């Protein structure tokens, strides 16, 4: 019976310790992801803005 109790206690303790360790790592990792996402969003916005302008220019030149 003590084996079962020990089995229950160990999993409960492990996630707490891992959560604390992962918190620091997760914070740094999340910050990196946020920075990368911001860069990607900026690039996407620039690319999206340039895309329609380029196609619009082609269409206009085609009409002329």
Curated annotation (Swiss-Prot):
InterPro entries reported in the protein's UniProt record: TMA7
Biased composition (Basic and acidic residues): 27-45
Positions of modified residues (ADP-ribosylserine): 61
Region called Disordered, residue ranges: 1-64
Tissue: Expressed in dermal papilla cells with aggregative behavior.
One Pfam family in the UniProt entry: TMA7
Record's keyword annotation contains Coiled coil: yes
Superkingdom, natural source: Eukaryota
Keyword Methyltransferase annotated: no
Protein name: Translation machinery-associated protein 7
Organism of origin: Homo sapiens (Human)
């Amino acid at each position: 019976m003590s084996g079962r109790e020990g089995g229950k206690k160990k999993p409960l303790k492990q996630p707490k310790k891992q959560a604390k360790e992962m918190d620091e790592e997760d914070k740094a990792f999340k910050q990196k992801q946020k920075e990368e996402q911001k860069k990607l969003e900026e690039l996407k916005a620039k690319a999206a803005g340039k895309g329609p302008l380029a196609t619009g220019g082609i269409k206009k030149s085609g009409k002329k």
